[in-house]
Amino acid sequence: MSFNTFIQHIKSEKYCQLGFWKLSEIGIPCNPIHWFQFADDAAVISSQEKENQMLLNRFTIWCQWANMIICVDKCSTFGIKKHLTKSMQYLPKLFVNNDLVPRTEMGKSFRYLGRYFDFNMSDEEHKSELLDVFNDIMNKINELPLHPKNKILLYSRYLLSKISWEFTVSDISKTWICETLDSIATKYIRKWLELPVSATLSNVLLPQNKFGLNIILPSTKFIQCQTVSRSALKYSPNVDINNLWAVTSTNKNIQYDIYKDTKDVLKAVRKENEQRLQNHLISQGSFFSSIMNHSTSTFNSLWSSVQSKLPKNIFNFTIRYINNTLPTRKNLSKWGLSSTSDCSFCSSPETLLHVIAGCKTYLDEGRFTWRHDSVLNFLASTLTAVKNSTLYADIPSFMNPSVITGDRLRPDLLLVTENRCLYILELTVGYESNLLVNANRKRQKYSDLINEQEADYDKVKFVNLSLSTLGVFGRSCENFDGMLSSLKCDAKYSKYIKKQIVNICIRTSYYVFCKRNKVWDNPKLMLI
């Protein structure tokens, strides 16, 4: 309030004349004086030293009256004058209480409100400081014994926030940010997620509801900060500030003026990553393309919630699974780390699909059946709690569905409720690209059985639970929610059931992958 009082004081008509001081007898034109005040930081810009000194004297007198101390050692002066036809830096002589205000050395800069100013108006000090701070903090985060998701959280919440003011006030080019800070960030992110150099980060830059990690690179944060700065100029109530926006709406600023706000920036960047995954990165974008076309979007946020609670090794497994950079023999051969790309059991190319859901030898050994039955066992154990119902499941320790359906067609699970409603649940756990194919195949397979059972029950409902090996729910699973609701499972319990299904799928697929090219030991069904 004290500083505001002083500002109002020097804005009065008497002292406004200082801003246009004129020696009419010798014909010196009007010279503008500008006073900038922000909290306890002040800056005075004038055309002549004596004008500046006059305003400083007034400020000094006012501070003495207010019993406030001016720390001269914390002040600085910076001077530019015209010599012949060129402008040059010089050392001005301005005093406060007869003490010479420290002068900015020739070729050096001073800092005001976070922005460095020098004679050349370069951003070298900003770049140097940003680089030092960024490297230092990223290195400290890297050394912390934290889960990768927590390291990414520190990077996103702390580091990007810390450098956002520098991004806002400086004129650093976006190119420098991309080539320098983005490179450092991606290097550490790859390290934390155990991603090879060849892996794309387009997946992890997506939002969590699209199976990404919601990571923002420094260049994106920079565009957001510049957008905020430009928007403040454009919509300022001050006409002069609006004019400043109009004058500077050229060259590099055009790329920031196209955005309405920071959300608009994120939307554009993520759209670009999605297009890259769908149209250019065929191998690493196959997962994204499949789930965008065939998954149940309302269930996708649950997947990210489960992923965030996984231990480091399985968490990183899901990331590398999504962008297809797990060490399969096909990838190892591509990277020059393996002499063969073939599976040691069946001699087919060992791709991710082959290891996770495609190898015929693995299928015959029961690896994929073990994963399927682990999910089914959880479902059956959970649904036995439904009151006044009878459950049949095609796994040991439960009544077999063949009691009702016979041996020709045997669904994974049958549930008969007290109101004579028969739920026929068929579970499929396959590769993401086969979500729709598996669902259609099972629907056709059991269509006759459904018609047959309608003669014996008041209602027959088919629940086509088509899941991916990483726990993604296919679109055919939408009626699974309806089934849980009909069985009087509240929203919280339904969410728990779906999360556990995702959890089991991810963990069993991780185990199947780790046992590739190894003897299968027929483990017990996974319990969580």
Name every feature range the model reports, one short phrase each.
Residues 1-18, 159:
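Conserved pre-motif C helix in the palm subdomain of viral-like polymerases
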Residues 379, 411-415, 419-433, 444-452, ...:
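Conserved catalytic cores of phosphodiester-cleaving nucleases, focusing on short active-site segments
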Residues 167, 176, 180-182, 188, ...:
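Extended C-terminal regions of large enzymes
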Residues 69-108:
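Short, conserved micro-motifs composed of acidic
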Residues 333-337, 382-426:
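Active-site metal-binding core of divalent-cation-utilizing nuclease and nuclease-like domains
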Residues 334-382:
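Short Cys/His-based metal-binding microdomains
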Residues 95-172, 228-242:
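Basic, alpha-helical interaction scaffolds
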Residues 33-65, 81-85, 121, 362, ...:
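Catalytic palm subdomain of template-directed nucleic-acid polymerases
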